[in-house]
Design a protein with these regions (language model features):
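Catalytic core of non-heme Fe(II) oxygenases with the double-stranded beta-helix
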Residues: 1-76, 81-84, 88-92
Length: 92
């Protein structure tokens, strides 16, 4: 809803970080944007990636797949509802 946001984070857990198993390199995150909400506001829900820094302004119907270990964040300050589907998966 309005004012929603997620501070910078990754989607790796302790098991993913076990170097012996090596699962972290095979884990990915997917975001599917069903509704991007109000992008005319000051915080339009930009998906920010870190190291290297990149910004992506989502569009309805867009699918973004990235390594689960990549630090990212998103802040949305619009009044309209924003609807996304987020999934983490392993490519084994």
């Amino acid at each position: 809803g309005a004012g929603a946001g997620i501070p910078s984070h990754t989607h790796l857990n302790k098991l993913d970080e076990d170097k012996l198993l090596g699962l972290g390199d095979q884990k990915f995150s997917l975001v599917y944007y069903l509704s991007v909400g109000d992008q005319s506001c000051s915080e339009p829900g930009v998906l920010k990636f870190y190291e290297p820094d990149e910004e992506l302004l989502p569009e309805e119907g867009m699918v973004v797949i990235f390594p689960a270990g990549r630090k990212h964040s998103a802040v949305y300050g619009g009044e309209k509802k924003r609807v996304i589907v987020g999934i983490n998966f392993y490519a084994l």
